[in-house]
Amino acid sequence: KEVEKHPEKDEIREAARKEVQQWIDMQIGVSLSPEERAKVENDPSIVILNAKMVYKRKYTFDPETKQEYFLKWKARMAVVGTSEVAGLDLVWSTFSPTVGFAAIRLMMACLCNPKYTVGSYDMTGFFLGAEMHDRTVYVRLPRDAVGQEGVVLRLLRAAYGLRSASRDAIAQLAKLILSFEETIAHEDGDRVFKFHKLAVEHCIFRYVDSL
């Protein structure tokens, strides 16, 4: 309702359309048929989580004028994970990823070593698309999910808002990096990795969704 009253509603709708398309392109979930949806909705043991669209104004910085300028509207569709019940919907622990001091000390030591070439990467959509653990989650898309309003999905991959999203994403990233030849994980667990490729030593430091 608030979007309909907003003077920039067309730009906001376009941002929502792009977010829905990203879910489709990444195959986050599959739509239920009318028969499947009726069966799920009538089953008292199944909880259908709601999703909502979160909007944010993105800005860019002009180094010449040293001012920020509006760039675009950004939409993000998130599952309302607060409706997940511990012990029923979640049978394992959840956590918020943080940085460890041991990782910081090791990273600073590597940065001071001239033999390393330093680069940083932001993993776009890091928490979106990770393979889920062995459980079934149903999500009802919001009214402003352009073209998919009210559709019920069975998630195939983790989505923003799920309490297990960070756990799933980090586990998948660690599994990928550890698949490299001669890779070792340091005492900091899934935050620090070291491997050799083409006789070159590589060190990877992870902080939330940045490398």
Please annotate each region the language model reported.
Residues 1, 208-211:
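Short, intrinsically disordered, charge-balanced linker/junction segments flanking boundaries
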Residues 1-199:
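Chromodomain-type histone methyl-lysine reader module
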